[in-house]
Amino acid sequence: MSKTHFGFESVEENEKAKKVAGVFHSVASNYDLMNDLMSAGMHRAWKAFTIAQANVRPGFKVLDLAAGTGDLTKAFAKAAGPTGEVWHTDINESMLRVGRDRLLDKGVVTPSLLCDAEKIPFPDNYFDLVTVAFGLRNMTHKDAALAEMRRVTKPGGRVMVLEFSKVWDPLKKAYDLYSFKVLPWLGDKFAKDAESYRYLAESIRMHPDQDTLKTMMEQAGLDAVKYYNLSGGVVALHMGAKY
């Protein structure tokens, strides 16, 4: 069986899925806290930028993959309105349940679905927009997931990937210190789970950099792929169209 990486560890492909599931079952109840710790609260600004770039309009069909606690889903559902169709999806049952409950608590009624991004259960050319925020790096076969995202996107639609990326060189030393020393300590102190936070830091380092991901999206068949660096490359928003 083929090998892949789980953080810095080399594991069998089927083992990665189990390990990633374990991480997100563990952090689900504290996921918003995790995002705050990992990003020093900046994830809200990055998501707001993504929402603005998405420009969802009334009647849009939107697929939010690895949607977690539903920050993007909530904004898209409000923008698409009653004539739209916005799906809140995640491969992890714990994350899906937490996200669904939080959406309902905020008065957002939209369908939630347990969904593997490598095998999306929707027909070709269905969605105006497909998004994944902070989820692609945890997927075993990123190329397959990107191809699936393109498949279910309508001609004229877009795929958007918001993900941690490669920081600019002047920031690297401080960023490494925060990621590998401070973040696990915070995870232990506030969530009693240093190991999950250590994996998340490692998974960021193993994720393709900005230009590599751009090439992967092009190889998946997406057109006019571009990206924006946010916060010195800590995060990048990639966007590709389907012509």
Curated annotation (Swiss-Prot):
Functional note: Methyltransferase required for the conversion of demethylmenaquinol (DMKH2) to menaquinol (MKH2) and the conversion of 2-polyprenyl-6-methoxy-1,4-benzoquinol (DDMQH2) to 2-polyprenyl-3-methyl-6-methoxy-1,4-benzoquinol (DMQH2).
UniProt key word S-adenosyl-L-methionine: yes
Assigned protein family: Belongs to the class I-like SAM-binding methyltransferase superfamily. MenG/UbiE family.
A Gene Ontology biological process term: aerobic respiration
EC number from the UniProt entry: 2.1.1.163, 2.1.1.201
Official protein name in the record: Ubiquinone/menaquinone biosynthesis C-methyltransferase UbiE
Top-level division of the source organism's lineage: Bacteria
Reaction(s) catalysed (UniProt annotation): a 2-demethylmenaquinol + S-adenosyl-L-methionine = a menaquinol + S-adenosyl-L-homocysteine + H(+); a 2-methoxy-6-(all-trans-polyprenyl)benzene-1,4-diol + S-adenosyl-L-methionine = a 5-methoxy-2-methyl-3-(all-trans-polyprenyl)benzene-1,4-diol + S-adenosyl-L-homocysteine + H(+)
HAMAP family according to UniProt: MenG_UbiE_methyltr (MF_01813)
MF annotations from Gene Ontology: 2-methoxy-6-polyprenyl-1,4-benzoquinol methyltransferase activity; demethylmenaquinone methyltransferase activity
Gene: ubiE
Pathway field: Quinol/quinone metabolism; menaquinone biosynthesis; menaquinol from 1,4-dihydroxy-2-naphthoate: step 2/2; Cofactor biosynthesis; ubiquinone biosynthesis
CDD domains the UniProt entry points to: AdoMet_MTases
Keywords, in A-Z order: Menaquinone biosynthesis, Methyltransferase, S-adenosyl-L-methionine, Transferase, Ubiquinone biosynthesis
Positions annotated to bind S-adenosyl-L-methionine: T69, D90, D116, A117
